[in-house]
Amino acid sequence: MRYAVVTGVSSGIGKAICEKFLAKGLYVFGSVRKKEDAKYFEEKYPNTFHTLVFDTTDYPAVDKAVEEIHKVVGKKGLSVLVNNAGVAKYGPIQHVPIEELRQQYEVNVFASVYLTQKLLWLLGASKEAKWQGKVIQISSTAGVMTRPMLGPYSSSKHAVEAIYDALRRELMIYGVEVVLIEPGPIKTEIWGKAKSGGNPYKDTDYGEIFAQLDKAVDEIEKIGLPVEAVAGKAWEAFVAKKPKARYVVAPKKLMFKAAMYLIPDRMLDKIFYKDLKKLTQES
């Protein structure tokens, strides 16, 4: 039996990855914040799905979950950890509340790193281990290319990219692989949850722009790939003997890669500035 841990399986990318791994025969520990959010998997996979109820930022609860995992896995070890849980917020860096920025990092960065640290020994990060697992971190194309107004989310994903690059290189001494999955536009609920339902920046020079962001996000989601596309890449990374360091999952992938790695920063500045001007004209 191969064991996996997947965080944030109640919906979206996490749910799709959990479903994929279960369908392929893995025993999956899936984390949710409310037990009822795991009902779908508990009923469909009663023998191979194990519900873990915790908020990833609640470290004592995470510690208990790790103990729970260890009791089941024992000396067999984990095959893979998929860090998926995350939140998204947008707003102008000039005015975004520090607490909101901190929340992005608490969930998207620190909570992810904490769980990874606690599970690495079960993934074979030890000289005595007789197995080597994988860490799959769900990042974002926003972790490489930053759009205006997405600074809070994008900066947290930049941090994720750097930390897991470092971890990948450090864990080479154990043979434990670390992979980054970088989704672009995906039909998922994360941005729907990010919508404020108001305009906290209406009294700033960004008020008109922010007022149009929800519409802009809706337009991006229309061209988004299904969450199953990300799940497919996660599975590809898991089964690969020599997985890539990172996998981009986006419509028009070559265009995204060009924007991320080839187009000069100043040219991107002009492109994004035109987008901002367009938003003000639409308000």
Curated annotation (Swiss-Prot):
Keywords: Lipid biosynthesis, Lipid metabolism, NADP, Oxidoreductase. The gene is capC. This is NADPH-dependent 3-dehydrocapnine reductase. Pfam families: adh_short. Belongs to the short-chain dehydrogenases/reductases (SDR) family. It catalyses: 3-oxocapnine + NADPH + H(+) = capnine + NADP(+). One of its GO terms (molecular function) is oxidoreductase activity. SUPFAM superfamilies: NAD(P)-binding Rossmann-fold domains. The lineage of its organism: Bacteria, Pseudomonadati, Bacteroidota, Flavobacteriia, Flavobacteriales.
